[in-house]
From Swiss-Prot:
Co-factor(s): Zn(2+)
Chief location bin: cytoplasm
Gene name of the record: ybeY
Summary of the function given for this chain in its UniProt record: Single strand-specific metallo-endoribonuclease involved in late-stage 70S ribosome quality control and in maturation of the 3' terminus of the 16S rRNA.
Protein name: Endoribonuclease YbeY
Highest taxon of source: Bacteria
Bound cofactor: record note: Binds 1 zinc ion.
EC number(s) per entry: 3.1.-.-
Enzyme class: hydrolase
A Pfam family per the record: YbeY
Amino acid sequence: MIDFDNQTDTNLDITLLESIATFLSPREVELILLDDEAMRKINQEHRGIDKSTDVLSFPLEGGDFLPLGSILLSIDRVRAEAELRGHSIEAEAALLFIHGMLHLLGYDHEYDQGEQRFKEEELITRFGLPSSLIVRTEEL
């Protein structure tokens, strides 16, 4: 289940994201949709990086009764990548949501020898997302 906090004026259909979340975990996930400036501020505050990014994830520790964590998406980045790659903003949001969910579940592409990327490709295929998103996973 997704607790969706849309802080933008963009309408995003999260039906597919709900299916992905349910498939990956029985725990609730918070999804926050932000603009680039809000994302930049959060990235600076939590990671010391003074620029925006497409997705951030913040896991919650403490047991199976708490939400899994929070995933933040920059709608500006989602929209730009979707246009560049020729797919919908929902498809791009799904890729970034998958990426964030896997981080919440303990995957870390910086250290895991490609396990997260492989899992992302598997989920892209499973949920019928455009194959162009598989190429996109190489850049995340």
